[in-house]
Amino acid sequence: GMWSMTCTPSRHGTLLEGIRAAAGDKAEILYAKGSNIYYDAETEKAATGIRPLERGDNRKLLDEALRVASRSDVIVAALGECAEMSGESASRTSLEIPDAQQDLLKALVKTGKPVVLLLFTGRPLVLNWEDTNVHSILNVWFGGSETGDAVADVLFGKVTPSGKLTT
């Protein structure tokens, strides 16, 4: 989340690390980046306020994602916005998932494998196509330093995202 910048990075894991820890030796977890946020590097820089550190060729990223997907039983796609794309002075002309990510998601759905969409965002997004074509959607917002473990707990059934506050 936006305030994660004040944490000690070495004490907090990524989504991939959380999923791998939750799976342990019971499942092989495969990973591919899949896409950049946007096709165009300058658009991505303007939208995020930062120059992407690990930007790759979108076609190569998509091809790699499809190779990994072909070896998978279930596809977990972590898509959406980065924290700089939400909030004050972060207007967008579209409230859909950015185009490069939409194309990735559509290609993953075409594989015929079950697709779980993890949606990272700080605002509501228009998900008409996703709602019709993706097996499940979990809006994880910008959860902060424990997001990886928390999302993995939901994916592996350790907790149910019921939205109920305990007393």
Walk through the language-model features, giving the residues of each.
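C-terminal non-catalytic regions of proteins with extracellular/luminal or membrane-system context
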Residues: 1-167
